[in-house]
């Protein structure tokens, strides 16, 4: 058999598609080799485990020349895999050629010229011993395969690629029809076949195909470049060019959203940029919609995560309204106090569609939305201190309203009715008790119906009106209804400014209205209502300010009540102008008279009613009277200094209840120091815990004006032209518009990187949906070919 130690035995593996057709006898003691071709080194080595055999000659024959199909035997001369016996084995074979009493385990080593001996790692063997292997492999086979293919790993009897699992996607190296195998990433590769040989061949084929696959090769290239950097950073470095192109697309989408433009405008914007030399592929409205969704999601995730990590106290503001498409929606806002901001921060949370307007549905929608944003029930129990909304029965009903159901889950929260709505209700309650006020309301509503007819009639009516007065007449809306004071003031002031022109119009077509305008009592009532509404408008505007808190609101309300008391004694700004206006040239054509059919308003009774209802609705709130007393503890100007002793026992008892309401512990030593310093001097520094408690008090929202602003933005976004937008899409657009920075200050790069990490395609990827191009007819192009 040749010189000892020099016998060369060549074998061929049953690899490739023919592997499943192998007819080799099923035997545990088989040896299999895989070759990738003459251009690659030795790829596989599987050791042989021997046992007793009565026919040693046949045994060695099977070792030296394994049984195989003829088609596989024809390729023997292509292989460069070699197996060398040791000296001991050759001597034993030469002495006992015909029989062996006991076959020893042969020792083989793979050699490639020059011959290099590799000793297996002991630690790797121990790891193999602890693994659950595929049912067609033994430990030595598994060890040698994992040694040869460094990327191969075994988990729970299944194969996977640790390199592909680490990188997962190709990033900038992505190509069309080239994808990383999900099975190799997730360790889900298993053998196929009904017998051991077929299953072994199946695994060899799968390993071979994955090893030579284009996607795996690109993964290997990425890993070679990641020697001194993490995989994630490497992908981003490889994607720099693509990211820069995608950033420009994100900036375009962001600008469209901030300017409330339809996302379909991106096609025109990108067409212009392509004309200027910028070429990318994310230029359809579908891509723009996905990008807007991603930006909104990332914004919320980052902002709300920071709030939760800071353990900030929060107040929830909600309101309900209908969209253009008549869908009932719930807008949710959140006001919180954070360390980096001196004043509370108001944040838009979401716009949600309501399946039903019953209280239970609203509560479920609210809590589900908050949970989706990361605010769990445990967090809300520890940090939710207040809930604010308008005075609708569904929301603030005492028996089964939203507020009542929230109190069942969070019993310590403060329920606050919007002060602006309460202000309007106090005015409505006052005028509803005086019948004469209805004449003014009916008249202005009649003017509204006349001048808000279809465009043709409106143009005819306003044809003779001066341009400066045309705008004022269009402003005339309804008054004394479910609208805030500023709206009623705008309508009444518009009538005041257009008074002579209205009389001229009505004298020709509406004689009844003209007679009413000629009644001096009507002019006096109009002036009085403008003076009253002006005070209400000033207060309403001040209450809507984001910087107004509970204490400041109380001061503003008391100031307005004093102004109305002064108006009761004297005359208002507009009332004092009546005599001069009647004598002026503008009013000279109006024959003023006193018509007893329309009596003047009982001025004193009206003002008394307004003052009384303002005190009842805005100041004498039994539900919040104790809370106001607790909050006064943080305002030294309200303290009864003549009763204060050191330490202030009564104040410390109140402090205990205040801490329970605010869900924040004020240090007792800080409070005592705060009291002592204020007794000695007025201008003192505020201790840390006292300062934070005052900030938490300011977190309580006093109105739902922000929710009204949100609905105003919703109406701007969801017009009749864009009514196909879903509620979720409108919510995303509102999120970017309300929470996003200005375009000049906004950095799109982090959003693009997170977009890439979510396996979305970048702007340079040609696999994305392409925008449709407008095809010009030959006749349209023909005119440009004229010479």
Curated annotation (Swiss-Prot):
It is an enzyme of class 2 (transferase). Keywords: Isopeptide bond, Transferase, Ubl conjugation, Ubl conjugation pathway. InterPro entries: RNaseH-like_sf. Residues 1-223 are annotated as: Sufficient for E3 SUMO-protein ligase activity. A motif (PSRP) lies at residues 38-41. One of its GO terms (biological process) is protein sumoylation. There is a cross-link at residues 85, 119, 125 (Glycyl lysine isopeptide (Lys-Gly) (interchain with G-Cter in SUMO2)). Pathway: Protein modification; protein sumoylation. Residues 1-36 are annotated as: Disordered. Its EC number is 2.3.2.-. Disulfide bonds: none annotated. Residues 42-50 are annotated as: Interaction with SUMO2 2. GO terms for molecular function: SUMO ligase activity. Residues 30-37 are annotated as: Interaction with SUMO2 1. E3 SUMO-protein ligase; facilitates UBE2I/UBC9-mediated SUMO2 modification of target proteins. Binds UBE2I/UBC9 and two SUMO2 molecules via its N-terminus. The most N-terminal region interacts with the SUMO2 chain that is covalently bound to the UBE2I/UBC9 active site, while the second region interacts with another SUMO2 that is non-covalently associated with the same UBE2I/UBC9 chain. Interacts with UBE2I/UBC9 and SUMO2. This is E3 SUMO-protein ligase KIAA1586. It comes from Homo sapiens (Human). The gene is KIAA1586.
